[in-house]
């Protein structure tokens, strides 16, 4: 909403310069063109937010369905526990490879001294 030209206060306090036969039509038209652009931008922003709201509402509904189906997932929790153990073993092996190589490099450099 960075491209909004006027606040409601700006519109309320706008003063047009009177001419011999009333206000300058070009001044009024210029102001109204800016107001129209603001309204168009507001409309686009509202439409974008509605679409985002619909998308997020659908996502919440989808996640709620997954959570409500969670009762069957909880019954299979031991399988998840085994999977977690497997992940921890893999992580431990990876750490040994990475940090073990660093330790070997440190030991080799200290033997050179």
From Swiss-Prot:
Residues 32-70 form a coiled coil. Gene3D superfamilies: 6.10.250.660. Pfam families: DivIVA. This is Cell cycle protein GpsB. Belongs to the GpsB family. It comes from Pediococcus pentosaceus (strain ATCC 25745 / CCUG 21536 / LMG 10740 / 183-1w). Transmembrane segments: none annotated. Its main location: cytoplasm.
């Amino acid at each position: 909403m960075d491209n909004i030209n006027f606040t409601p206060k700006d519109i309320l306090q706008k003063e047009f310069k009177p001419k011999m036969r009333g206000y300058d039509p070009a001044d009024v038209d210029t102001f109204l063109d800016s107001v129209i652009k603001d309204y168009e931008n507001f409309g686009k922003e509202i439409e974008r937010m509605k679409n985002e709201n619909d998308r997020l509402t659908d996502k919440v509904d989808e996640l709620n369905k997954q959570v409500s189906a969670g009762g069957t997932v909880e019954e299979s929790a031991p399988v998840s526990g085994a999977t977690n153990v497997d992940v921890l073993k893999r992580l431990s092996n990876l750490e040994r490879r990475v940090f073990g190589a660093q330790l070997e490099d440190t030991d080799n450099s200290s033997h050179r001294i």
